[in-house]
Amino acid sequence: MASKDAQNQRRGLPGFLPGAPDPDQSLPASSNPGNQAWQLSLPLPSSFLPTVSLPPGLEYLSQLDLIIIHQQVELLGMILGTETSNKYEIKNSLGQRIYFAVEESICFNRTFCSTLRSCTLRITDNSGREVITVNRPLRCNSCWCPCYLQELEIQAPPGTIVGYVTQKWDPFLPKFTIQNANKEDILKIVGPCVTCGCFGDVDFEVKTINEKLTIGKISKYWSGFVNDVFTNADNFGIHVPADLDVTVKAAMIGACFLFDFMFFEHSLAGL
């Protein structure tokens, strides 16, 4: 009796797939070699196949269609009038912080290269783990010098390149391209002819490669006269489809940092 119960328990083990043969019954030998080859070539169940995983730390980005970036006010820079390392809070639509970004650069570059300085921005999650690294080399920022324009390298996780943000030469409009790890164009970003804001928001449209369809925008929010004149603290919003690839969203976060350096870092530029 005990042996029969043990056999029944073995037959009901949860590890067997529905419709799988009884392990106590031997499979009939096939006399046709073709049938044996067909059995060996059967695909594995989907539960055993490797799944495409997101870069660690970017899982939360897959749920967002609005990402808010808030630059922290540096009191020391306000008092002394010096350029300090930028710090940013990255939040969801509810204002909850999901990431924190800190600029790494040397004082010499901040003093003498100003907004053109080379730097590295390290983005960490709320546990302090670095999830995105943004590298910015020293480049030009002029429509009169189209050979050495701005470029960012996006790594997620650190050490793994997932994309680039590159400036494209245009005599009238600020234009940028988001590229994948192979430097293939994915999306374009087109800004307005005048980026000073004039007491309002400044929108950079996110478009398809042919620039015929707008799928989102990156907005620099006007923070008010006092804040924009006396501080360099800026607020940005990234509006994109929620199902957009998380590595592209990470590149857009890097693009916000680049726009801040290029167009809004000086106090009067935000007006």
Curated annotation (Swiss-Prot):
Residues 1-33 are annotated as: Disordered. GO terms for molecular function: phospholipid scramblase activity. Transmembrane segments: none annotated. One of its GO terms (biological process) is plasma membrane phospholipid scrambling. Residues 1-10 have a biased composition (Polar residues). One of its GO terms (cellular component) is plasma membrane. Residues 1-45 are annotated as: Proline-rich domain (PRD). The N-terminal proline-rich domain (PRD) is required for phospholipid scramblase activity. Belongs to the phospholipid scramblase family. PANTHER family: PHOSPHOLIPID SCRAMBLASE FAMILY MEMBER 5, PHOSPHOLIPID SCRAMBLASE-RELATED. This is Phospholipid scramblase family member 5. It comes from Homo sapiens (Human).
